[in-house]
């Protein structure tokens, strides 16, 4: 038996847990909104479920999502939650006006002045108290915005307070506008440092306010979005990121305009041309230390200064890379991406093919397009040349990049230090810390580029054998140095140990689809799970072979079947699915009909019982068993009244009968 102190301690812990955490259902009931609206509100406010340890989860359920109670209570009086409730009330008014045919009221309700809208300005200020915090979230924001700027909208709507399951025209236009403004800023400020073309799209990296921002732009191609996909979670993130980037871009553009104005003023006054350097001022990194500052603070400032100097050196190499070069981009090349790289590196993009004003022509064809004549003074290169020059921070020789030539390997600058410079090495080391699984192999093309940059460079491992061995024998766990074993350390195994070592499990080929603890299951459950192939337990070898043979026979029959047999099999599967759907629909209809019949019969029976009760009361009044009260609003039982009077005469009190529960006899659908 549990001691009373232990029971009390359990109760106190449970109550404390309930006060500190709320489940998703409790949170939605507290906020009086649906789960879809609650999820959207949490995304906008930056509130996420909490991962609890097992002891806490056992108190209220292992499969539930838990939120901090104080965070949910903050949402009760939040402006966005209030606007959501106002929108629900507005929807009811619109439906009422449509049902009653009030066209004038409907026009007034649908105007932008009456329709509720929410603002994310206060939310962004809450989530990002400092500007550098917003810069650190730009990578995810721009990747998502570029994705939805490429997709075509499916719903025409300018507002976002409604919960749309597909991309709206308003969000699509705003996403395209933000992408254009971001590309314009990166090109004007010349902060682009790396680029890479992959099968997913174009990867870019820029240094903005001392932070490395990486984003992905998808390849632009004709697409058709699959129907029936719910996108409201992604659209909620998109809405927030668009509003955040509006603030970020305004700040960046205003700072850039101020820096350009200061530079021009300084050039006019002093005649000194200064580089258009990015402002890396960031809090304590540039603060002047007091005399009595501690060593930890001095070390942090020193690291920030070294990081800042490396980034400045990296930007200085890229900004004047294509200075004096003019590129003409052919029509088959995506001009948006290559114009961004060229402009960010100090080059110019020509709109017309005028050989006297052009130095390079970017063509993605095996030969020149019709109508374009080849000139000897021009260099005709493939698109990879632009990105390789950016990553090498050097105008590479065009050998191997000309039209019709086989291109060299396109190396990712995010996992390998292409230039072997201090700033690149520091960036790659940081990436490997964040992503330990990145392979440290250096391709031969990287050694060639390093040799071009620094003629005195000599590769330590040009063929990559050492790196290959390190990747092959490296493990996630740290290796422990084990001394070599001598003959004295050798111990012979016994017969049982040898037999155990040679024994192979009989269920080696069996697929494990679910992990189940066997001691907790009954024999019947074990048998059922073996039949359904859902248990992590030894299966009979004969059964396993039979299943494997059956699977192989099915695969063989599907490989050898004709198109007519395949069509017939597909048609039979479709018929089975349709039959199952019809059966399910029929079951649902039967349940609805039974529920409706139960409701109607309950109403009819209740009416009949009420009529019978009234008739019985009228009969008792006629027989004299009941009489009316003095005010005429109630009835009194004469026999019960006489008994009460006799008890009062004897000085006793008649025991009162408890009033019945009025909801006890009602049907369940009423309760």
Swiss-Prot record:
The organism's place on the tree of life at top rank: Eukaryota
Keyword NAD: no
Domain BRCT: 317-403
Keyword set, alphabetical order: Coiled coil, Nucleus, Ribosome biogenesis, rRNA processing
Region ranges (Disordered): 552-577, 634-671
GO molecular function: ribonucleoprotein complex binding; RNA binding
Coiled coil ranges: 294-323, 548-584
Subcellular location: Nucleus, Nucleolus; Nucleus, Nucleoplasm
One matching Pfam family: Pescadillo_N
Function recorded in the entry: Required for maturation of ribosomal RNAs and formation of the large ribosomal subunit.
Family: Belongs to the pescadillo family.
Protein name: Pescadillo homolog
Species: Leishmania major
């Amino acid at each position: 038996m549990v001691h009373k102190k232990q029971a009390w301690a359990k109760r106190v812990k449970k109550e404390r847990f309930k006060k500190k955490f709320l489940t998703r259902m409790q949170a939605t009931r507290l906020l009086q909104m649906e789960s879809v609206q609650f999820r959207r509100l949490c995304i906008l406010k930056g509130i996420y479920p909490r991962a609890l340890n097992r002891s806490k989860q056992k108190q209220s359920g292992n499969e539930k999502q838990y939120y901090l109670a104080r965070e949910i209570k903050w949402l009760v009086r939040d402006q966005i939650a209030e606007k959501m409730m106002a929108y629900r009330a507005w929807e009811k008014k619109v439906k009422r006006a449509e049902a009653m045919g009030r066209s004038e009221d409907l026009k007034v309700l649908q105007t932008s002045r009456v329709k509720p809208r929410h603002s994310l300005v206060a939310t962004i200020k809450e989530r990002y108290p400092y500007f550098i915090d917003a810069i650190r979230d730009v990578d995810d924001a721009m990747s998502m915005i570029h994705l939805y700027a490429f997709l075509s909208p499916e719903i025409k709507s300018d507002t976002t307070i409604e919960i749309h399951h597909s991309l709206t025209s308003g969000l699509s236009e705003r996403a395209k506008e933000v992408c254009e403004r971001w590309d314009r800023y990166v090109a004007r400020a010349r902060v682009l440092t790396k680029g890479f073309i992959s099968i997913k799209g174009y990867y870019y990296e820029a240094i903005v306010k001392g932070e490395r921002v990486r984003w992905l732009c998808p390849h632009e191609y004709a697409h058709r979005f699959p129907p029936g996909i719910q996108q409201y979670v992604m659209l909620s993130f998109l809405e927030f990121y668009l509003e955040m980037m509006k603030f970020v871009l305004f700040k960046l553009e205003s700072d850039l305009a101020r820096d350009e104005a200061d530079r021009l003023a300084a050039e006019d006054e002093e005649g000194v041309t200064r580089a258009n350097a990015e402002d890396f001022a960031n809090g304590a990194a540039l603060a002047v230390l007091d005399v009595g500052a501690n060593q930890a603070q001095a070390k942090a400032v020193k690291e920030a200064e070294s990081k800042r100097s490396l980034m400045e050196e990296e930007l200085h190499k890229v900004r004047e890379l294509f200075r004096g070069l003019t590129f003409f981009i052919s029509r088959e090349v995506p001009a948006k991406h290559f114009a961004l790289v060229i402009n960010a590196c100090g080059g110019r993009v020509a709109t017309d093919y005028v050989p006297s004003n052009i130095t390079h022509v970017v063509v993605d064809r095996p030969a020149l397009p019709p109508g374009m004549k080849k000139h000897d003074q021009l260099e005709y290169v493939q698109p990879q040349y632009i990105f390789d020059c950016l990553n090498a921070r050097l105008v590479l020789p065009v050998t191997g990049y000309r039209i019709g030539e086989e291109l060299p390997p396109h190396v990712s600058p995010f996992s390998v230090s292409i230039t072997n410079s201090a700033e690149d090495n520091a960036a790659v080391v940081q990436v490997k810390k964040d992503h330990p699984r990145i392979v440290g192999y250096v391709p031969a093309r990287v050694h060639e580029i390093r040799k071009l940059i620094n003629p005195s460079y000599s590769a330590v491992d040009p063929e990559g054998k050492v790196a290959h061995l390190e990747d092959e024998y490296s493990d996630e766990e740290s290796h422990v140095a084990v001394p070599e074993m001598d003959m004295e350390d050798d111990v012979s195994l016994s017969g049982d140990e040898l037999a155990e070592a040679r024994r192979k499990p009989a269920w080696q080929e069996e697929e494990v689809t679910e992990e189940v603890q066997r001691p907790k299951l009954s024999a019947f459950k074990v048998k059922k799970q073996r039949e359904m192939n859902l248990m992590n337990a030894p299966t009979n070898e004969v059964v396993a072979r039979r299943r494997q043979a059956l699977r192989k026979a099915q695969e063989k029959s599907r490989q050898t079947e004709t198109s007519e047999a395949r069509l017939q099999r597909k048609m039979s599967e479709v018929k089975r699915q349709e039959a199952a759907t019809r059966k399910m629909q029929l079951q649902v209809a039967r349940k609805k009909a039974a529920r409706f019949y139960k409701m109607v019969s309950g109403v009819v029976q209740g009416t009949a019982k009420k009529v019978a009760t009234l008739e019985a009361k009228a009969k008792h009044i006629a027989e004299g068993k009941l009489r009316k009260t003095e005010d005429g609003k109630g009835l009194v039982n004469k026999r019960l009244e006489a008994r009460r009077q006799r008890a009062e005469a004897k000085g006793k009190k008649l025991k009162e009968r408890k009033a019945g529960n009025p909801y006890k006899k009602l049907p369940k659908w009423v309760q």
